[in-house]
Amino acid sequence: MAAGLREFAARELAADRAIHLLGIALGITGAIAIVVIAAAMRRLGDLPPILIYAAGLLAMLGCSAAYNMFRTSRWRDWLRRFDHAAIFAMIAGTYTPFTLLGLKGTWSIALTAVIWAVAAIGIAIKLLKPHRIETISVGLYLALGWIGVVAAGPFMAALDPVTLSLLAAGGILYSSGVVFHLWRRLPYQNAIWHGFVLAAASVHYAAVVGVVVEA
């Protein structure tokens, strides 16, 4: 969850800190719960994509919390790099249960490979040469986030309507939150943005649970 660059008032930082702490708590609890769900259903073969999803989610939440909560750290530049890189990992990780457990055949392999190839390039650039794509970062995140529309037909055929609706709703929440991410002068802008991210991640979590149950 990348942060804005302006200085925030103490009350704004407190609100943002609360959002991050809630996110970490929910993320850890949710990651454990979804693994337990898969194990309880004897779906051990489903664990790799679930673990990838959980790792991407926790990476985003953890890196965002570190960057936004430790604002005076001498490692701030690197915290920012990891914060931004983790967004690519989160997007690709979120797609993984749907592409590997939901889709079948060529679509499953091809879409997973493309998503992770783009994410890997984005992660590498954000860690090593972050300023190269700074001005188009938001566009790249949105493009990767909505890349699944190219497989709209296969997804509609493979996923339960409720799961599909949750997947789309999460994407809409993420995209809507970008407005507040860019609205730098709005009071509590950063906390609102991160609230949208947490809400979207929660909706996508419900969708992942759905695809695990369906698989």
Residue ranges, per PLM feature:
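Multi-pass alpha-helical transmembrane bundles in non-GPCR membrane proteins
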Residues: 1-215
